[in-house]
Regions:
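Residues immediately within or flanking Cys/His clusters that coordinate Zn2+
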Residues: 102, 135
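Short cysteine-rich clusters marking metal-coordination/redox-active sites
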Residues: 105-108, 138-141
């Protein structure tokens, strides 16, 4: 059957466009490995165009944004707290297993790449240099990621919320 207004064509992948009203949700989605476009400088028009051009689901608490004609897929996020917002979105799409946890830059949304410790040694704090060996780098902003205390804290928070995270692969990094 061909697409109609009530049955638009299917999404190729679960990708999101997040607005300022649910900004912290973007970082949580990225933590799980979802492609979640967000930039605080984006206005409603830019978000709507991005969603239309890239086949993204718009997540917002702004009804006016979601009523824009260009938006094919959107969700009015009802929860007020970021973790509750995440669970609301995951429930909506029937997702409980994180697709690729700790694989994206929380700031840029870019997929992280493994980096040899020797190449970034000069950028590491002394204790990080001593205790950690697997690192990933954001090719866009240059941020370095590793499985430190923040990583463990986020795993615990997400697991306690019911999100299924695969066991860590030490060779893969965060």
């Amino acid at each position: 059957a061909s697409p109609t207004l009530l049955r638009p064509h299917a999404l190729e992948a679960l990708r999101f466009a997040v607005d300022e009203n649910v900004a912290k949700l973007a970082a949580l989605l990225r933590t799980l490995g979802f492609d979640a476009a967000y930039d605080r400088r984006f206005g409603d028009g830019r978000i709507a165009r991005l969603a239309a051009e890239e086949g993204r689901v718009v997540l917002s608490r702004d009804r006016a944004l979601l009523k824009r004609g260009e938006i094919v897929w959107g969700r009015l996020v009802r929860a007020a707290q970021p973790l509750d917002q995440l669970l609301e979105v995951l429930d909506l799409f029937g997702v409980r297993r994180a697709p690729a946890p700790f694989s994206r830059c929380l700031r840029c949304n870019v997929v992280l790449t493994p980096v040899d410790k020797r190449d970034i040694l000069h950028r590491l704090e002394p204790k990080t240099r001593l205790y950690y060996h697997a690192f990933r780098l954001c090719p866009s902003c240059g941020r370095i990621f590793w499985q430190g205390s923040h990583h463990e804290h986020m795993r615990r928070v997400l697991s306690e919320a019911g999100v299924i995270l695969p066991d860590d692969d030490p060779a893969a990094g965060p």
